[in-house]
């Protein structure tokens, strides 16, 4: 039975028993900052279990995409080395939200395994929580499991909780006996042993208590069930294999790697580990990118980067010199695309993101490995076996080596890594970064706003149809606390029962304006929306005293609102134009819509060409000139999706959504404010296009008068440049070309003179050459205006020597610089890198390089003479 057949069979089994089949959620958990990735089937049902969400069904079943590669589930270093560890896996599950409980859950699990799949009951064992007599009796009396096959374990193994407080309850696990041939051989081996003989295949969690802060547990009024069975594990049972990597779920990728590498699986254990690593990481990488994660140096993106770079290193170990991970996407999609069609829809985009990251890492991999190998060699010579935190940080910060990748590489040499030292370096860097941090705009919900919302304080937004409104002041906040009144000069937050002010959300900046009563005036400098139905005006009382309960007039700053609306509608048109020019893979990855500009982040794998930017500008301006009417309509989310409206990738929407349409060219789910017709935008001009992360580009643009003023500024600059270059008739390009040609000519003259100067200088320096063990050696301090010129001088000296070693030093800006060069005929016997490593500590620095050329820098220029004097003693 294939993995795809098993998945379908499981879902059908529970669908036939009244369960709603629910698609897997994205790997990026929605509105759950406690989770890096979805790592269990119950993640998407968390609010259902807590009684905070009613989905219209009380029984559900799913096959959930999961990733475990960070936090307490960080098994990355074991992936590929064991039979069971994975970064990506699928969790089959059935769930009851106050519907059935232990009797039914146990019956379903036993029936599916023993009757539907036909597993041998004599090879199945169960565990229960030590105090859960109820579950033990159900297993024995209802399902006929002998008492000796029912094992009891404590809270560590068989009790589940959502946190320190909240829903919790006992677990009951089902184990499969793989047979004594895969066990540890101990006569005491039984369920619970760490060996591979007894393998957990299904876990049933019975949520029946609520744990309070003092540890007291009270029964839940509606107990629930959460179960999970790893698809990869049940596949090993059904396919009669001992390793998850031998199932068809992963063998397809391994066979693909065999074909690409020309190597055979199961012929060399080292190669086997690399093939398993690539097979697992290819699945994780493909699914993560498909679900919107992109490689970066923080958060989820950093986990993805670690996975990809570990796979890239193992590909190199298999002999691949060119990027190959992107080529495994075909094999992953061949196996998984039928169940997850989004993989096929985004296949080309996924490949391009992977290849771009592989090429980026390839640029630094060899250099980083050279640094690491030098460090290992030096530490071995000193009798040490721990890679220092400073070295780890340099490899991470300069060459993109995650610490677990470094640990993986040096393990074979018997080395470990100094993780605390690395964290200390990272902490110093974070502290420096924090000094320059200006905030991300993603503020958490303040406690006072939560309290007001829980108390029932609400705001109705009426700003789609009006910019002025009359309302009652429901609450005034000052310094994070609720007050009855506020006086002139005080900063406040004001909540009214209705408001025309748009609260910052969906990338659109909040409105500004004024709030007035008969005796007070407030200047509103910003508006936020901590909850969909709670809008908070922020500002300063500029006159009088404003009081809770008073009636007030609210007036939005019309000029800013209109400018923001122009930019927001233009953003919608921009997305349409980008998809037409670049392709359907373009998805919104973020945006900012403010009165003075717009910013749009989107998924794309390469920098846009000038021609592509020009075409996008032309398309958007054509839409503006066509002046289509802008319509907004609320509808059911299903209707909106069926109509083809564009949704923000990964966003979770309610039952009702607002769809904004611009003629027939754009339709998006959007709650923002817009112009009435496209022509109101006036004009559109792109200011810049740049990459902000792997696979993510950013466009900044202007509309209306802002675009016109920008063009006028460019014309002014052009006139100023023409005047500076004395370009007749404003022919800047012709004049500039002539100036550049003259500059190149002068540069050639300088280089010729520099060569003559070096030759003359080298003639003087050669008088200091000594012969050591049959090798001509020159070690001397020189005066140069730029340390980079040490290399040019060394090349000249090597040519004049014919065969020998040149060591040069110079002082510049209070720093010592050293360079060692070895002629090619001696590089096999004398290594420049070995010499420089001996000299660098003398000048208080570090260095490295290749056999023929190495450099070092240090903080003690007064020690240059001593360092250079050591060179002669290092020539063997």
UniProtKB/Swiss-Prot annotation:
The processes (GO biological process) annotated in the record are:
alanyl-tRNA aminoacylation; negative regulation of DNA-templated transcription
- Write out the residues that bind Zn(2+): 568, 572, 670, 674
Write out the entry's keywords from A to Z: Aminoacyl-tRNA synthetase, ATP-binding, Cytoplasm, Ligase, Metal-binding, Nucleotide-binding, Protein biosynthesis, RNA-binding, tRNA-binding, Zinc
InterPro entries on file: aa-tRNA-synth_II/BPL/LPL, Ala-tRNA-lgiase_IIc, Ala-tRNA-ligase_IIc_anticod-bd, Ala-tRNA-synth_IIc_core, Ala-tRNA-synth_IIc_N, Ala-tRNA_ligase, Ala_tRNA_ligase_euk/bac, DHHA1_dom
**Known catalytic reactions:** tRNA(Ala) + L-alanine + ATP = L-alanyl-tRNA(Ala) + AMP + diphosphate
The cofactors named for this UniProt entry are:
Zn(2+)
Free-text comment on the cofactor: Binds 1 zinc ion per subunit.
Supply the EC number(s): 6.1.1.7
Which Gene Ontology molecular function entries are recorded, alphabetically?
A: alanine-tRNA ligase activity; aminoacyl-tRNA deacylase activity; ATP binding; tRNA binding; zinc ion binding
- One GO cellular component from the entry? cytosol
The compartments listed are:
Cytoplasm
**What does this protein's UniProt record list under function?**
Catalyzes the attachment of alanine to tRNA(Ala) in a two-step reaction: alanine is first activated by ATP to form Ala-AMP and then transferred to the acceptor end of tRNA(Ala). Also edits incorrectly charged Ser-tRNA(Ala) and Gly-tRNA(Ala) via its editing domain.
Can you quote the domain comment?
Answer: Consists of three domains; the N-terminal catalytic domain, the editing domain and the C-terminal C-Ala domain. The editing domain removes incorrectly charged amino acids, while the C-Ala domain, along with tRNA(Ala), serves as a bridge to cooperatively bring together the editing and aminoacylation centers thus stimulating deacylation of misacylated tRNAs.
User: Can you tell me which family this protein belongs to?
Assistant: Belongs to the class-II aminoacyl-tRNA synthetase family.
Q: Which NCBIfam families match?
A: alaS (TIGR00344)
Protein name in UniProt: Alanine--tRNA ligase
Q: Which gene encodes it?
A: alaS
């Amino acid at each position: 039975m294939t993995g795809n057949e098993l998945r379908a069979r499981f879902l059908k089994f529970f669908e036939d028993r009244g369960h709603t089949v629910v698609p897997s959620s994205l790997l990026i958990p929605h509105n759950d900052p406690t989770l890096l990735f979805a790592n269990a089937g119950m993640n998407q049902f968390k609010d259902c279990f807590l009684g905070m969400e009613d989905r219209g069904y009380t029984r559900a079943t799913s096959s959930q995409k999961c990733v475990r590669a960070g936090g307490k589930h960080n098994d990355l270093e074991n992936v590929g080395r064991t039979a069971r560890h994975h970064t990506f896996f699928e969790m089959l599950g059935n769930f009851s939200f106050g519907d059935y409980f232990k009797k039914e859950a146990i019956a379903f699990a036993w029936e599916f395994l023993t009757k539907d799949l036909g597993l041998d009951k004599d090879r199945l064992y169960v565990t229960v929580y030590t105090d859960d007599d109820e579950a033990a009796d159900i297993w024995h009396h209802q399902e006929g499991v002998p008492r000796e096959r029912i094992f009891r374990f404590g809270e560590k193994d068989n009790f589940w909780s959502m946190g320190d407080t909240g829903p919790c309850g006992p677990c009951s696990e089902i184990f499969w006996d793989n047979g004594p041939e895969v066990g540890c051989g101990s006569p005491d081996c039984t369920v619970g042993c760490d060996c591979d003989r007894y393998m957990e295949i299904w876990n049933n969690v019975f949520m029946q208590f609520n744990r309070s802060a003092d540890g007291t547990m009270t029964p839940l009024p509606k107990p629930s069930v959460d179960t999970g069975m790893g698809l990869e594990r049940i596949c090993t049972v059904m396919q009669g294999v001992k390793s998850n990597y031998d199932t068809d779920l992963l063998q397809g990728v391994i066979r693909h790697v065999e074909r690409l590498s020309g190597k055979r699986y199961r012929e060399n254990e080292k190669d086997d580990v690399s093939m398993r690593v690539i097979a697992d990481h290819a699945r994780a990488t493909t699914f993560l990118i498909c679900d919107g994660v992109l490689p970066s140096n923080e958060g989820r993106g950093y986990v993805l980067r670690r996975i990809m770079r570990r796979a890239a290193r193992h590909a190199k170990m298999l002999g691949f010199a060119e990027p190959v991970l992107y080529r495994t996407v075909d094999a992953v999609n061949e196996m998984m695309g039928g169940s997850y069609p989004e993989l096929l829809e985004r296949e080309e985009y996924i490949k391009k993101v992977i290849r771009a990251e592989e090429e980026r890492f390839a640029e630094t991999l060899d250099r980083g490995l050279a640094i690491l190998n030098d460090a290992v060699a030096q530490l071995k010579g000193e009798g040490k076996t721990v890679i220092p935190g400073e070295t780890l940080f340099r490899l991470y910060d300069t060459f993109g080596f995650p610490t677990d990748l470094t640990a993986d590489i040096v393990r074979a040499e018997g080395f470990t890594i100094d993780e605390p030292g690395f964290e200390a370096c990272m902490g110093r860097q974070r502290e420096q970064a924090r000094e320059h941090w200006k905030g991300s705009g993603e503020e958490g919900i303040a406690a006072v706003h939560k309290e007001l919302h829980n108390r029932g304080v609400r705001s109705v937004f009426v700003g789609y149809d009006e910019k002025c409104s009359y309302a009652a002041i429901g609450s005034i906040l000052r310094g994070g606390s609720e007050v009855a009144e506020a006086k002139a000069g005080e900063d406040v937050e004001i909540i009214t029962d209705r408001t025309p002010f748009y609260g910052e959300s969906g990338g659109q900046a909040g409105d500004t304006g004024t709030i007035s009563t008969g005796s007070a005036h407030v200047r509103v400098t910003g508006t936020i929306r901590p909850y969909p139905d709670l809008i908070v005006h922020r500002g300063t009382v500029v006159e009088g005293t404003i009081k809770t309960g008073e009636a007030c007039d609210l007036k939005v700053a019309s000029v800013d609102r209109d400018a923001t609306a122009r930019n927001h509608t233009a953003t919608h048109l921009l997305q349409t134009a980008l998809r037409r020019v670049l392709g359907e893979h373009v998805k919104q990855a973020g945006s900012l819509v403010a009165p003075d500009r717009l910013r749009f982040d989107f998924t794309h794998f390469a920098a846009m060409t000038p021609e592509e930017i020009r075409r996008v500008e032309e398309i958007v301006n054509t839409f503006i000139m066509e002046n289509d009417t802008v319509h907004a309509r609320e509808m059911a989310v299903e209707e909106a999706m069926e109509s083809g409206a564009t949704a923000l990738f990964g966003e979770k929407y309610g039952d009702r959504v607002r769809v904004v349409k611009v003629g027939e060219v754009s339709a998006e789910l959007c709650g923002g404010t817009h112009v009435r017709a496209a022509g109101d935008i006036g004009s559109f001009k792109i200011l810049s296009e740049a990459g902000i992360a792997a696979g993510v580009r950013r466009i900044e643009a202007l509309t209306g008068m802002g675009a016109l003023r920008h063009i006028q500024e460019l014309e002014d600059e052009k006139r100023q440049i023409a005047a500076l270059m004395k370009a007749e008739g404003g022919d800047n390009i012709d004049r500039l070309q002539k100036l550049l040609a003259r500059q190149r000519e002068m540069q050639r003259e300088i280089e010729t003179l520099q060569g003559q100067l070096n030759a003359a200088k080298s003639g003087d320096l050669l008088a200091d050459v000594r012969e050591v063990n049959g090798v001509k050696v020159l070690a001397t301090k020189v005066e140069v205006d730029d340390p980079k010129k040490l290399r040019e001088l060394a090349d000249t000296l090597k040519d004049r020597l014919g065969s020998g070693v040149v060591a040069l030093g110079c002082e510049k800006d209070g720093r010592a610089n050293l360079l060692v060069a070895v002629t090619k005929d001696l590089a096999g016997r004398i290594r420049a890198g070995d010499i420089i490593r001996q000299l660098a500590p003398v000048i208080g620095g570090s260095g490295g390089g290749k056999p023929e050329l190495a450099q070092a820098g240090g903080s003690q220029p007064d020690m240059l003479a001593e360092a250079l004097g050591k060179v002669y003693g290092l020539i063997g």
